[in-house]
Amino acid sequence: MRIVFMGTPGFAEVILRALVENKNNQIEVVGLFTQIDKPFGRKKELKAPETKTYILENHLNIPIFQPQSLKEPEVQILKDLKPDFIVVVAYGKILPKEVLAIAPCINLHASLLPKYRGASPIHEMILNDDKIYGISTMLMDLELDSGDILESASFLREDYLNLDALSLKLAHMGATLLLSTLKNFSSITRKPQDHMQASFCKKITKADGLVDFKDAKSLFLKSLAFKSWPEIFLENNLKLLEVGLVENEKSHKEGEILEIDEKGVLVGCLKGSVRIARLQAVGKKPLKAKDYLNGRRLKVGGILA
């Protein structure tokens, strides 16, 4: 079984690794298509996609392609690889009909479709306080995440997970699911999506990290969803790090400092309260909340803003 893999971030790298290291010798990854290396960090140094890095660091004999678009000659390159399947996991590009015609294109999407079509399904699961997390394999068509569902898997939330932890758990679950889909493809009954039930999610931007002290639960969920980037910050760009939900019932002044101790600062919201362990001002290193407040001479009864 010849597989062309299309994927870019760490989530996709987990899936690629599972395909490459699978004990079933029938699976052969014959090519990786991924995004171009992009500037990263303050120094804007070029950083390779995690999928590419995995192949290079492990000295795997898998050709790597980083095309700007999927037109000619890329379509011919794909044809020459003679794939039995094209597997797509967080690739970041739309596949044109010329590519879809080469071989069955299977997309592993991190949601229970038709829920959360689009670029940020794992963020949306967290932000919407979902009780069930899941993942789907889908036969791709020309529309965004709208193809027939092949298989799905899910689990009941036992505790709150931040983006990194949930992504990793879903990636490992997705790897198992994808291997099942590839093995059983010919016998799987495809399930058309109910497009009336579809919901959509957008690409996350820096502005999504802006928070206030109106609703404690919402602030807490954003801290989980945006942990890696863009993080969460107030209007003055003060970052709130390591946020815990204390309660979501009582009413307080917005941003009122209720308590200060070694664990952090307890801050009131119009609904509920949160405990913040560390704070980071613009251009400064993160500080324990207590030390930051002492430096600003903020005490219980004051307003964190």
Protein language model regions, located:
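N-terminal Rossmann-like dinucleotide-binding module
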Residues: 1-42
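N-terminal beta-loop-helix "entrance" segment that forms/cooperates
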Residues: 38-57
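Conserved beta-strand segments of alpha/beta enzyme cores
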Residues: 28, 61-63, 104, 239
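Conserved beta-strand termini and adjacent loop/short-helix elements that scaffold enzyme active sites
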Residues: 35, 65-67, 140, 152, ...
